[in-house]
Amino acid sequence: MAAPQRSGSAALLPSANGAGRAARRTARQVPEELLNNVELREAVGALPSNYNFEIPKTIWRIRQAGAKKVALQMPEGLLMFACTIADIIERFTDAEAVVMGDVTYGACCVDDYTARALGADFLVHYGHSCLIPIDATRGLKMLYVFVDIKIDTSHFLDTIRFNFAVGSSLALVSTIQFVAAVQAASQELQSQYKVCVPQCKPLSPGEILGCTSPRLARDTDAIVYLGDGRFHLESIMIANPGIPAYRYDPYSKVFSQEHYAHDRMHGARQAAIRSAARARCWGLLLGTLGRQGSPAILQHLESRLRALGRPFVRVLLSEIFPSKLQLFDSVDAWVQIACPRLSIDWGEAFSKPLLTPYEAAVALGDIEWQQPYPMDFYASQSLGPWTANHTARPAQEKPPATPSLKKWH
């Protein structure tokens, strides 16, 4: 597409009165003496100025918690800054800093278990949203730092105006790093366009994940994604196959229309479901990379397979590779409780069907095949107990009748 050529903290109990709200503000407010600390400002100057690592807030929270060992976890794209941040923390607090170097794909990879095993009493997770609640990391204080990235929003706005007619209905989405930029852009565009910044709770407005995206109104003219890469964009494209999608890369300032092979993906996933429906022995893969695996989903699948008389084996893996699964000759079909995109994007690389929990529900007759394909893995409102945040998990004493497999042969 053409572009114009121009140069997480400790929880506080809610209160019904204003005093409670004031107390919360006081507890969360970074002291002025820390914000204005000349030495701290000089130290922060070693980090890129357009990346907000929230160093004063981090120092303040560590001091508040009285932490002695702080674990730092971040995606590989930010690891180059880890040593600098660790040095700052050790200089301005009484804590020792430990950098966790294992791969971190997303907010689902929050690794409080390893942090505790290392003896840490405080974990700072960078670059992702609060997918795992801070009160779920027992025995470990936690802080999420989104690492908001400042960009040239004027060029982004000019690009939108150059490519879309006034009055168009636009859905603006991004990853957590650019959500603030999306919000600012939506305010600027509202006078000329019908702008929507959709939300799929518990995510922030405008935020999408590779496995979780909202369904949009049918009269939406275009999806505009602000970010580099396609992984997250593909999620909302899968959830909204009839809406044209565009990507603005804030680094290269390139604006492009993006396409997705929906029919090919649907065909591949339906073929895997048909094959799995005939399987005798099932393998249940629980991802152990941080918090990727959901024990609740695992328990639900175990209950369903028992009710249907299907033998199964449980396997725990941090990362799932075809060569590893080939070692299990007796397993006829796999269900991986880790990342749905592993099956969607790479399922054909495996010799046996590798289903998502949703696809397993289809194969077992618990739900019909959905159009469009649901991208609701972490959504608060999801289709059923094969998603991570589904709360109404019905008892399985009286499971649905054993499905007819004719439609999946």
Swiss-Prot record:
Origin species: Gallus gallus
The EC number(s) this enzyme carries: 2.5.1.108
Cofactor(s) the record lists: [4Fe-4S] cluster
Binding annotation for [4Fe-4S] cluster: C108, C211, C339
Keyword Disulfide bond among record annotations: no
Cystine bridges: none
Subcellular localization: Nucleus; Cytoplasm
Record family assignment: Belongs to the DPH1/DPH2 family. DPH1 subfamily.
Signal peptide: none
Catalytic activity: L-histidyl-[translation elongation factor 2] + S-adenosyl-L-methionine = 2-[(3S)-amino-3-carboxypropyl]-L-histidyl-[translation elongation factor 2] + S-methyl-5'-thioadenosine + H(+)
GO cellular component, one term: cytoplasm
GN (gene name): DPH1
Molecular function per GO: 2-(3-amino-3-carboxypropyl)histidine synthase activity; 4 iron, 4 sulfur cluster binding; metal ion binding
Origin: domain of life: Eukaryota
UniProt xrefs under NCBIfam families: diphth2_R (TIGR00322)
Comment on bound cofactor: Binds 1 [4Fe-4S] cluster per subunit. The cluster is coordinated with 3 cysteines and an exchangeable S-adenosyl-L-methionine.
Cross-referenced InterPro entries: DPH1/DPH2, DPH1/DPH2_1, DPH1/DPH2_2, DPH1/DPH2_3, DPH1/DPH2_euk_archaea
Positions of region (Disordered): 1-22, 388-409
Pathway note: Protein modification; peptidyl-diphthamide biosynthesis
Subunit structure: Component of the 2-(3-amino-3-carboxypropyl)histidine synthase complex composed of DPH1, DPH2, DPH3 and a NADH-dependent reductase.
Function: Catalyzes the first step of diphthamide biosynthesis, a post-translational modification of histidine which occurs in elongation factor 2. DPH1 and DPH2 transfer a 3-amino-3-carboxypropyl (ACP) group from S-adenosyl-L-methionine (SAM) to a histidine residue, the reaction is assisted by a reduction system comprising DPH3 and a NADH-dependent reductase.
GO biological-process terms attached to the record: protein histidyl modification to diphthamide
Record keywords, A-Z: Cytoplasm, Iron, Iron-sulfur, Metal-binding, Nucleus, S-adenosyl-L-methionine, Transferase
Name of the molecule in the record: 2-(3-amino-3-carboxypropyl)histidine synthase subunit 1
